[in-house]
């Protein structure tokens, strides 16, 4: 019997909720129309505000003049690239014979047990070297 009493109450609550939903939806429509009229009157400002809002979300109107002054004070130095060509100078050495041996760098013949690792070929690395 207690259950039959609660059923009519639920119907009354549903009726109340439908009326409140209708009034809320009408209010939302009115708010949207008001917002659209504001957007139509100032489309350029809203676009500029939206782009600045995305780039700097926490910036205020007071910070903007300060940043402009800072950027005007700091002047960056642009590096200059100078393209040159190869020099025509030659290296002249006096008193030394013009030999290929003098121009190449040769390692010492006696490196001890590590001599085989200094050779560039793998076959020479496994050759037995007797320097004694």
Swiss-Prot record:
Q: Where is this region: Interaction with ATG16L1?
A: 1-60
**Which keywords are on file for this protein?**
Autophagy, Cytoplasm, Mitochondrion, Nucleus, Phosphoprotein
Kindly list the biological process annotations in GO that this record carries: fertilization; flagellated sperm motility; mitophagy; protein localization
What is the reported tissue distribution? Answer: Predominantly expressed in the testis (at protein level). Expressed in the sperm midpiece (at protein level).
Q: Where in the cell is it found?
A: Cytoplasm, Cytosol; Nucleus; Cytoplasm; Mitochondrion
Region Disordered, as annotated, extends over 1-81, 110-132
Molecular functions per Gene Ontology: protein-containing complex binding
Q: Where is this motif: PQIIIT?
A: 79-84
Phosphoserine is found on 87
Q: What Pfam families does the record tag this protein with? A: DUF4609 (PF15382)
Annotated region Interaction with VDAC2: the residues are 61-132
Q: What is its main location?
A: cytoplasm
What does UniProt give as GO cellular component?
cytoplasm; cytosol; male germ cell nucleus; mitochondrion; sperm midpiece; sperm mitochondrial sheath
What PANTHER family does the annotation carry?
A: SPERMATOGENESIS-ASSOCIATED PROTEIN 33
> What does the annotation say about its assembly with partners?
Interacts (via PQIIIT motif) with PPP3R2 and PPP3CC. Interacts with VDAC2. Interacts with ATG16L1 (via WD repeats). Interacts with PPP3R1, PPP3CA and PPP3CB.
Known function? Plays an important role in sperm motility and male fertility. Required for sperm midpiece flexibility and for the localization of sperm calcineurin to the mitochondria. Promotes mitophagy as well as acts as an autophagy mediator in male germline cells. Links damaged mitochondria to autophagosomes via its binding to the outer mitochondrial membrane protein VDAC2, as well as to key autophagy machinery component ATG16L1.
What is the protein's given name? Spermatogenesis-associated protein 33
